[in-house]
Amino acid sequence: SWWQGKELDYGITHSEAKVFIGDDERLQRLEGLVEDIPRISVRCDASAYTNSVAFEEVVEPNEAFPLVEIDPEDDASIMYTSGSTGYPKGVVTTHRSIINTPVAWAFLGSMASQLETDGGETFVQPESPCTLAAVPLFHVTGSHSNFLLSLVTGTRIVLMYKWDPVKAIELIEKYKVTSFSGVPTMAQDILKASEDNPERDLSSLVSLGGGGAARPPEQIKAQEKNHPSKIAGV
């Protein structure tokens, strides 16, 4: 979360959240606010914070979670808007709408495998899929298209702290990243960084997806010219 303490306080209160999961930076921002909410601390000392327990303790084997009947139309998550004109607004999504994401991506993958390039090549699903998550997990792209889809398919995730195209192509080469999804400007950044750093091997990257804005035609042409075997999603 990029929220500061006041915004975290608002979101927790507005959503009527029952537990807060955060790292050292987020827990520091929340100190002195909504002290009654239980906190699960990640990668930090739980004893340093109010009403906090370590993540490692929470996930220790214990009693099985109770089975809960879930209807496809039940509420599943609340994503908050940017709040550019006031307090952020909570956008509720259902289980059905979230599950539709991996279903849609599976359909797109199946369609892609049946297409041929001008050179007669066909798209082959990588044996060891790996995705570069360079967008926030509090956004549907990071949460659903990156995290959830990877959870369903067993895809490895490489996380970036913040966007840096030069660092991105370094990670793509190092971890043999096979897919990337972000806004079109990020895809353009990758293409430009790869041109400026030709020593980087990006041959593992076979899918360059994106959304949030229309992909410029010149970007598609540049990708087809420089990386003809890679799929450009819109």
Residue ranges, per PLM feature:
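Conserved AMP-binding
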Residues: 1, 134-139
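Active-site charged/polar residues at nucleotide-handling catalytic sites that mediate phosphoryl
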Residues: 14-16, 174-175
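ANL superfamily adenylate-forming
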Residues: 25-72, 99, 194
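Conserved pre-ATP/AMP-binding loop-to-beta segment of ANL
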Residues: 62-80, 87, 117, 121-130
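Conserved AMP-binding A3 loop
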Residues: 76-105, 112
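Gly/Ser/Thr-rich phosphate-binding loop
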Residues: 83, 152, 177-182, 192-234
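Conserved AMP-binding/adenylation subdomain of ANL enzymes
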Residues: 99-130, 138-178, 193
